[in-house]
């Protein structure tokens, strides 16, 4: 079913088989969280001749034998190895799993440019470092990725056959453009934004962003997921409005099934995008969902001991029941304006034209006053009016002023609506009413423009006609102009 927003209501529903997120395999006894004391080592990893990064290794103290290991991949909002994943990586280490959290390479990473294949190569260097770390079993080394990092991990698992397992948490699955269309529509709807504003979301997100860079917005990990042949654990927070929590999991299940991989476990937690509780937003200091790390560790220890799809004594899909309002569209089409660069250019031209018209209005008014002083007596004797410019300056100035204010107010409103949507604040009735005021103002501007055009048309070429004739023509033109505006509207 197509929703009023232009995106499609989600129909790929996932039904959990149990509310219990616990993970266990029959016949396998695994070390649990807290079984070991841990230690940290800060190391440097050389990515190439010019770039090196820092990393943090956490490992269990006194664990016997070669241990399973896990490399962590950053999401979009993190980069420093000392500031992220500390609680998750430490918990894993206490369950006997060696972990490595590297810095994100930032010299080739920005808001406008991201090269995911290159990032996969860089993480591959860290993966090799972890595989050869003392006490690590190279055959039991896998990946943990969140959000944007899951796009990168999907490239790694497609290109390398030595990845023992893959954990995908808060995975977008679809391209960034498609994910943003779904997320923005959901955010705006939940914040109470006007319906007409929500309808324009897909038109904006589907624009050509090449004027700003942003080519990575089109990266789609779906083809890589069909090469996921190792055990996979998929995690989503049911409070995460930014991700396709049902559609994403179903897509992963479909893609792995096409590769003959049935060892895919899915868990849903009452948590946000970062698997934390206390707020739907990603805020510092929020606690992890209480069972999250324990389930991660039990799953890793089980699959690295050889657990297959038939060995699980717990359901493959479990946890809180997910609810995804809109589907991430498989394709998006822009409106009349297909390029963000063109849109920004038109906005700039509109503001520039307003300023130019304002200067013209001022010039017409000043020139008219100067000329009228010398010809006033002659015009009064002949009963004639000057043609172009008579009475135009004031309405032209008003039109320019209102147009500029209306454009700026609209940009402010859209920006404010986006801020409220992203902060999950519901718009007040008064704020929502501003949109109605802006729409009424737009109608008034169209009428004023029609009136102004009719005045100009009636005045051009009639400088030698009498005052009474001019006024009669203007009345006729005004009526025709208003009728045209109504018909066009």
Question: PLM ranges: what are they?
Answer:
Residues 1-9, 488-489:
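Membrane-interface motif at the C-terminal end of an N-terminal transmembrane signal
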Residues 6-312:
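Soluble extramembrane regions of membrane proteins in the secretory/endomembrane system
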């Amino acid at each position: 079913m197509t929703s009023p927003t232009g995106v499609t209501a989600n129909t790929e529903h996932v039904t959990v088989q149990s509310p219990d997120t616990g993970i266990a395999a029959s016949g396998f006894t695994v070390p649990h969280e807290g079984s070991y004391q841990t230690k940290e080592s800060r190391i440097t990893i050389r990515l190439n001749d010019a770039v090196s990064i820092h990393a943090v290794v956490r490992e269990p103290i006194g664990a016997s034998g070669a241990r399973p290991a896990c490399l962590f991949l950053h999401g979009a909002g993190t980069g420093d190895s000392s500031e992220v994943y500390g609680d998750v990586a430490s918990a894993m280490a206490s369950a006997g799993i060696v972990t490595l959290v590297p810095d994100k390479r930032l010299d080739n990473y920005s808001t406008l440019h991201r090269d995911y294949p290159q990032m996969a190569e860089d993480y591959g260097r860290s993966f090799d470092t972890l595989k050869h770390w003392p006490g690590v079993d190279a055959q039991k080394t896998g990946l943990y990725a969140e959000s944007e990092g899951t796009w990168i991990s999907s490239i790694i698992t497609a290109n390398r056959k030595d990845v023992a397992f893959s954990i995908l948490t808060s995975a977008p699955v679809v391209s960034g453009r498609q994910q943003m269309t779904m997320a923005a529509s959901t955010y705006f709807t939940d914040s109470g934004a006007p319906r007409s504003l929500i309808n324009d979301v897909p038109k904006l997100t589907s624009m050509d962003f090449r004027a700003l860079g942003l080519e990575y917005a089109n990266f789609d990990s779906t083809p890589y997921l069909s090469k996921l042949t190792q055990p996979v654990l998929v995690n989503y927070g049911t409070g995460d409005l930014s991700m396709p929590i049902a559609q994403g999991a179903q897509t992963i299940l479909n893609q792995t099934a096409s590769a003959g991989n049935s060892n895919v476990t899915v868990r849903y937690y009452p948590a946000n995008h970062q698997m934390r509780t206390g707020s739907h937003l990603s805020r510092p200091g929020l606690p992890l969902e209480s069972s999250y790390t324990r389930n991660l560790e039990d799953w890793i220890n089980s699959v690295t001991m050889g657990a297959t799809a038939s060995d699980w004594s717990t359901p493959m899909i479990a946890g809180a029941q997910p609810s995804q309002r809109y589907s991430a569209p498989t394709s998006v089409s822009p409106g009349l304006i297909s390029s963000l660069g063109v849109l920004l250019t038109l906005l700039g031209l509109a503001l520039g034209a307003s300023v130019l018209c304002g200067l013209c209005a001022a010039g017409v008014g000043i020139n008219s006053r100067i000329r009228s002083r010398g010809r006033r007596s002659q015009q009064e004797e002949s009963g004639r009016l000057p043609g172009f410019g008579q009475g135009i300056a004031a309405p032209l100035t008003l039109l320019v002023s209102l147009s500029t204010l209306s454009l700026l107010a609209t940009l402010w409103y859209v920006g404010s609506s986006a801020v409220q949507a992203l902060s999950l604040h519901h718009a007040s009735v008064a704020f929502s009413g501003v949109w109605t005021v802006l729409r009424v103002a737009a109608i008034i501007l169209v009428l004023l423009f029609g009136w102004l055009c009719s005045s100009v048309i009636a005045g051009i070429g009639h400088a030698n006609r009498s005052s009474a004739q001019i006024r009669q023509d203007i009345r006729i033109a005004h009526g025709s102009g208003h009728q045209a505006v109504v018909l066009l509207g």
